[in-house]
Amino acid sequence: MRFLKSHPVLSLANSFLIDSPLPSNITYLWNFGSLLGLCLVIQIVTGVTLAMHYAPSTSLAFVSVEHIMRDVFYGWLIRYAHANGASFFFICVYIHMARGLYFNSYTKPRVLLWSVGVVIYILMMATAFLGYVLPWGQMSFWGATVITNLLSAIPYIGTALVEFVWGGFSVDNATLNRFFSLHYLLPFILAALVVVHLIALHEHGSNNPLGISSKVDRLPFHPYFTYKDLVGFFVFFLIFFGFVFYQPNLMGHPDNYIPANPLVTPVSIVPEWYFLPFYAILRAIPSKLGGVIGMFGALLILLALPWLETSKVRGAGFRPVMKFFFWLFVVNFFLLMYCGGQHAEEPFITLSRICTAYYFMYFLVIIPVIGHLENLLHRCRD
């Protein structure tokens, strides 16, 4: 133990993974941070292995994926672990963020922690989009065409920017090469940001369900929380490998098993499920530029959250009105996800607009107003 604390490198690992003091009352909702680290390791290991056999060429990409599935030793397992690992990565990150929203983990002194986390989330979405293009199936090709075309909504420079991203006048070989290179690079940038996230967490410690300072009631990370995390790992692997072995394509799209054909447009262009809420926001606004602003605004508004919160009480556990609106927000998010997967027709367009309005209203109106009203009631009581 003395060696761990005196070694210049191992002392850092010791302070983060062994001696790090955590509140004694944190629940299993706090396990998702470690699960996200596990997901990132799975994605990097399987992704690097897949890259050894993948050919980033429009004529070979689809065939190389089939080669991985059929000819590479346990290639099917590596590919399905990578594809389902992305979905589980987002499941864990959405729960992790929902816990942060519920317990106000974004307020001072954890503003930097929250901001870095949001940047990680946005970078995750970019990485996942780039990866979705690589199999070069129908949904990959047309998804890339639709999403990259959104840049053309930018006045004056939009068209030139789209052609710059494509590397030509359409989604083609140059685009696939660029997306593959970036998809390989971004996970390592994500890993670096995760280290920054952990440093920010270590600065002020973790939040807790009560939302109060817990400096007098803390436990070391090891052995109390390492074993707790191991329980979470076992449950995670049980569910994860259940999908990988028995339902590997449940969260995918059958059109992506058809080779990309620029001459045949799919009946419905649907992104992966974790993009659907923001895809619904994009389609809910009639203006192309307005839809793009709405979609990116829905992500960037999370960065402004620490400054929108006005309540002096941390967490929704002691705020019944806020708790009601939070769970309404969760239901609203799932409704957006459902609408994003449907055809752009009534009643889904109207429902998407209502859900989009509530999404922004929750952050811009409900959170600040309820906080001010609660503070006013506290002052009146005193």
UniProtKB/Swiss-Prot annotation:
GO CC aspect terms: mitochondrial inner membrane; respiratory chain complex III
GO biological process, one term: mitochondrial electron transport, ubiquinol to cytochrome c
InterPro entries: Cyt_b/b6_C (IPR005798), Cyt_b/b6_C_sf (IPR036150), Cyt_b/b6_N (IPR005797), Cytb/b6-like_sf (IPR027387), Cytochrome_b (IPR030689), Cytochrome_b_C_euk/bac (IPR048260), Cytochrome_b_N_euk/bac (IPR048259), Di-haem_cyt_TM (IPR016174)
Segment forming the signal sequence: none
Stretches that traverse the bilayer: 32-52, 76-98, 113-133, 179-199, 225-245, 289-309, 321-341, 348-368
Organism of this sequence: Allomyces macrogynus
Similarity field: Belongs to the cytochrome b family.
Cofactor entry: heme b
Compartment(s): Mitochondrion inner membrane
Protein name: Cytochrome b
Binding site for a ubiquinone: H202
GO MF annotation list: metal ion binding; ubiquinol-cytochrome-c reductase activity
Note: Heme 1 (or BL or b562) is low-potential and absorbs at about 562 nm, and heme 2 (or BH or b566) is high-potential and absorbs at about 566 nm.
Task of the protein: Component of the ubiquinol-cytochrome c reductase complex (complex III or cytochrome b-c1 complex) that is part of the mitochondrial respiratory chain. The b-c1 complex mediates electron transfer from ubiquinol to cytochrome c. Contributes to the generation of a proton gradient across the mitochondrial membrane that is then used for ATP synthesis.
Gene that encodes the chain: cob
Alphabetical UniProt keywords: Electron transport, Heme, Iron, Membrane, Metal-binding, Mitochondrion, Mitochondrion inner membrane, Respiratory chain, Transmembrane, Transmembrane helix, Transport, Ubiquinone
Residues annotated as binding heme b b562: H82, H183
Top-level lineage group: Eukaryota
Main location: mitochondrion
